[in-house]
Amino acid sequence: LRYKGQRGKAPLVVTLFDGMRLKDLRIGLITVDGRDARDVFSQINWGVITMYDGITFGGFNYIIPERNFIVVYGNKPNLEEVEKALRAHFQDDRGREIMGVLERLTRIETRWGPLYLYTDLDLADARRIVEGYQVISKYPEPIRYAHVIGRAVGMWREKS
């Protein structure tokens, strides 16, 4: 875990799928290690069931989902290391909020391997949704697409 001290911007990508087809995408820019991810997300989200690739974006900028969400982690975060990094760099409530989510992750088994979820949906429904989008890996396609697009945008921004 590396602290970047609120330097620079990172892309926040939201994908919209119709079945297995990418229907639309929106991109916003958030401050690295900032506190604007929630506001940016609220401007680019469609308000449907949302799968999040974790809750931290652009370092320790974060979104605590409010409704109709599935937070997905491919691996269980090292809670001790995350808490240590949060305490070392932030004197606000983000540590408590982030740790509150990470401590409530539930391990599920999928046909592609284990995932860790935090959701306000019925766990069986969340699993069904996640597995419905697993095509070539344990990461659901909406998350996989957003990750690939976000990396490409980030690399392009670094070169410009």
Predicted features and spans:
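Charge-patterned, long linear interaction tracts outside catalytic cores
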Residues: 114-160
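Two-metal-ion RNase H-like nuclease active-site motif
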Residues: 1-7, 13
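Long, charge-dense
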Residues: 60-113
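Short HxH-centered metal-ligating active-site micro-motif
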Residues: 35-63
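Short beta-strand elements
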Residues: 11-19
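Nucleic-acid-processing active sites and adjacent nucleic-acid-binding tracks
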Residues: 19-45
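Gly/Ser/Thr-rich loops at beta-strand to alpha-helix junctions
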Residues: 2-3, 53-62, 74-78, 122-124
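Structural motif
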Residues: 13, 48-49, 68-70
